[in-house]
Design a protein with these regions (language model features):
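Alpha-helical transmembrane-bundle signature of multi-pass membrane transport and export proteins
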Residues: 1-435
């Protein structure tokens, strides 16, 4: 058992990766703090679901608009420099927001403006982080590194960070929580600055004079990736489901959940933080459970049904009047969603050709984000017009219906039988990839 545990944390023996991982852990705590502080700061300013919807939509717009540029920057610049710049900008913006909050000058539009920049910073950071990790670790430790991050993200960003944010807000104020979040981003930047990694040499230019360059080259690459998606039925169906899934659940989760906690439970930031913590703990448990087992034989069907049917407890979030019942529903959604993501990541690694994997991953991220602003923008008005209970009912029932349609549309049962994945390889196992 001790050997198994050692393999799971083996990437942390590398100094540069350890610094990057510590910085990520602290920054994710800050993101969790910011998530709770943002919601309660809007409420303290007298805002409701519509105002919170405006602010969260601003964040998603910054993310969506900049994500493709972030990918280009990660390929053309030093990833270390991009990460440091993104974290420094995010920290500086939150320092300004915290100062405005603590001095009583903060307004809703300040939060919206800050959210746009926070989203843009994240759009640059994520692809740079993804591109940097393989330069820090040997290939046989990348799977374990992904497992470490997959466990860390829900525990820090969705569990510990929100819980700490709820306590800080209840004891002090949202402004103090925002200040702490700002410091976490600056700490992360300092960790990455302390790394010794050097930029890779630039790739030699192609001799083919007819090869597209600049913007034409980027368009050609994106077109090739999109052509592959259109011709790969299971992949196209999965991306279609992901787009609708985000539209149905993200707005209610990000915009309406704080008001469900306040109105149904009579709760405050502490209860809200506990519900988000339940999402995170469930997510970590789901990721660990699915990654410690062999890939399911019906991997496409299992993945899609976990996303769809696993969202049914969203109905509970709109009707529960007991904290633990709401937390249990959140934990189930978190567990099934994270487990499905582990399978999805494995499929991108094993069924997408090597020369297309980066572009397909980028398209996946972009398509997943595409309707995020729409979901955020609609959630507040829909909650005011139809009620929070009705919106959460749609968020719970809608994905169930859509996932059944997508399994049929993508011909997933026949596809997964026609393309079996080696069960002995243990692609989703965090510890068995090394010889």
């Amino acid at each position: 058992m001790s050997k198994v545990r050692w393999k799971a944390v083996r990437p942390l023996r590398h100094r540069d990766y350890r610094l990057l991982w510590i910085g990520l852990a602290v920054a994710l705590l800050g993101s969790g703090l910011w998530l709770v502080a943002l919601a309660w700061q809007v409420i303290e300013l007298g805002g409701g679901p519509v105002q919170l919807s405006v602010v969260t939509t601003a964040y998603s717009i910054g993310l969506v608009v900049c994500v493709l540029f972030g990918g280009i920057a990660a390929d053309r610049l030093s990833q270390r420099t991009v990460i440091v710049a993104a974290d420094t900008v995010r920290g500086a913006v939150l320092l300004v927001v915290a100062a405005l909050a603590l001095t009583g000058w903060l307004e809703i539009w300040h939060l919206a403006a800050g959210a746009v920049i926070i989203g843009a910073g994240e759009a640059f950071l994520i692809p740079a982080y993804t591109a940097l990790v393989p330069r820090l670790l040997p290939a046989d430790e990348l799977l374990a590194a992904n497992g470490l991050e997959g466990t860390l993200r829900p525990l820090a960003q969705q569990a510990t960070g929100p819980a700490l944010g709820g306590v800080a807000i209840a004891a002090l104020s949202p402004g103090v929580a925002i200040l702490v979040a700002a410091l976490t981003y600056l700490f992360s930047a300092a960790c990455v600055l302390a790394m010794h990694v050097r930029p890779e040499p630039a790739a030699p230019a192609k001799a083919d004079d007819d090869a597209p360059t600049g913007v034409r080259s980027m368009i050609a690459d994106l077109r090739e990736g999109w052509t592959y998606v259109r011709q790969t039925r299971w992949l196209l169906a999965s991306l279609l489901f992901g787009t609708i899934f985000v539209l149905l659940i993200l707005g209610p989760l990000e915009v309406l959940l704080p008001f469900a906690v306040r109105d149904q439970l009579g709760g405050d930031a502490r209860e809200f933080g506990l519900i988000l913590a339940a999402f995170g703990i469930g997510g970590a448990a789901g990721a660990l459970l699915i990654s410690s087992r062999k890939l399911p034989r019906r991997y496409l069907t299992v993945m899609t049904l976990m996303w769809g049917i696993g969202s049914a407890p969203f109905v509970l979030l709109g009707i529960a009047e007991d904290l633990w019942l709401m937390a249990a529903g959140a934990a189930v959604v978190g567990a099934t969603g994270s487990a499905a993501m582990v399978i999805w990541g494995t499929l991108l690694q094993r069924r997408v050709p090597d020369h297309l994997r980066g572009r397909i991953s980028s398209l996946d991220f972009f398509v997943s984000l595409l309707l995020m602003p729409v979901s955020m923008a609609l959630a507040g008005p829909a909650g005011s017009l139809f009620g929070v209970t009705a919106v959460f009912a749609v968020a719970g029932i809608g994905p169930v219906i859509v996932c059944l349609f997508v399994v049929w549309l993508g011909r997933m049962p026949s596809d997964e039988i026609a393309h079996p994945l080696d069960q002995d390889e243990g692609a989703t196992n965090l510890i068995s990839a090394e010889a």
